[in-house]
């Protein structure tokens, strides 16, 4: 079976299933020449809110096609995605990457099913998720520099201060500050001051990106579009924000309790470095947690504003951006309150 990374000059249609499958067959004729074209079976997964994802199967073998959503290169660095993915695959944290086409990637199939939100909220899964995050942070090398604030500023450059739709424009002006760049800088100063360590992070551990293999009982992460070196605590904080769910309006009352967050951080530290696991580190992480939750909310709020202007996917990005921005303000104030209190 060919394992070297291959490039294909094909565009897969986001709108026509027939055209999309014809292009996929053309790619598979080169990537998997031993597969009988007419017997290839396609199965669609539409859980991502950015891309179109489907599998192509022949016999017991499968490969996954990820077709990038319209205009997503405005919010995703595709070069970085390939580099990060290959590095993660090398360390056993991602399915193998077989190749790329003009508007997407082809990768291996990870056995298992994405967690459902009820499962993710089940405390029995928390330890396994914490363990896998710890393993990721401990295993993949970085240069110690984070890109998270740079990415936010890049998103802002893509954001047009004027929405074409008057109703959307009014909503934007009413619910968001004029100077979002100042918000980023305000948070960045405090985050740098926290001196939290940097690790190679997934940065998007929502429910769809966490796969559980019922046979091996292992947790795996998928979808490394936003993977880059970042503060380790950001990865955890961002994951905590995702307990609210993605579909419809997020429900932040469903997030973990203080005690559950404490236990999760305790498990994470135990698996990451059991020899140096101490209360001081634990308390520092817990103290800084609202600041990093605020950072994650701000990141996705700005991301969603850009998506609201560019994405063709049927999702109310503007309402989502507002929900995230409100949480950003709440978590930021909680952090400021706790710091001033001590």
What are these regions (language model features)?
Residues 169, 277-342:
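Helical subdomain adjoining the active site within ATP-dependent kinase catalytic cores
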Residues 180-184:
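Short proline/glycine- and basic residue-enriched helix-capping loop/turn segments at helix->loop/beta transitions
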Residues 233-276, 294-312:
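Active-site activation/catalytic loop segments of kinase-like enzymes and analogous catalytic loops
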């Amino acid at each position: 079976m060919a394992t070297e990374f291959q490039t294909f000059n094909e565009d897969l249609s986001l709108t026509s299933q027939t055209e999309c499958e014809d292009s996929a067959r053309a790619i598979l004729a080169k990537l998997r020449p031993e597969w009988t074209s007419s017997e290839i079976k396609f199965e669609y997964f539409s859980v991502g809110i950015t891309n179109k994802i489907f599998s192509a199967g022949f016999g017991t073998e499968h490969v996954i096609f990820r077709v990038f959503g319209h205009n997503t290169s405005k919010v995703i660095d595709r070069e970085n995605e390939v580099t990060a993915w290959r590095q993660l695959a090398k360390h056993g944290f991602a399915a193998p990457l077989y190749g790329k086409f003009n508007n997407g990637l082809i990768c291996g199939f990870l056995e298992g099913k994405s967690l459902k939100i009820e499962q993710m909220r089940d405390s029995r899964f928390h330890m396994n998720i914490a363990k896998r995050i710890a393993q990721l942070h401990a295993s993949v090398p970085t240069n110690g520099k984070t890109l998270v604030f740079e990415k936010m500023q890049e998103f802002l450059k893509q954001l047009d201060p004027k929405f074409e739709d008057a109703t959307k424009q009014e909503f934007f002006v009413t619910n968001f500050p004029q100077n979002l760049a100042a918000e980023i800088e305000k948070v960045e100063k405090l985050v740098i001051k926290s001196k939290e360590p940097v690790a190679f992070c997934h940065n998007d551990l929502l429910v769809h990106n966490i796969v559980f293999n019922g046979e091996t009982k292992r947790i795996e992460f998928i979808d490394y579009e936003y993977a880059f070196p970042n503060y380790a605590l950001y990865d955890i904080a961002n994951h905590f924000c995702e307990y609210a769910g993605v579909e419809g309006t997020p429900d932040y009352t469903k997030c973990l309790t203080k005690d559950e967050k404490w236990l999760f951080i305790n498990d994470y530290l135990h698996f990451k470095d059991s020899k140096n696991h101490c209360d001081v580190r634990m308390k520092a992480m817990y103290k800084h947690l609202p600041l990093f939750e605020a950072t994650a909310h701000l990141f996705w709020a700005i991301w969603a504003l850009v998506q609201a202007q560019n994405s063709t996917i049927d999702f109310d990005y503007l309402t989502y951006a507002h929900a995230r921005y409100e949480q950003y303000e709440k978590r930021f104030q909680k952090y400021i309150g706790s710091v001033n209190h001590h």
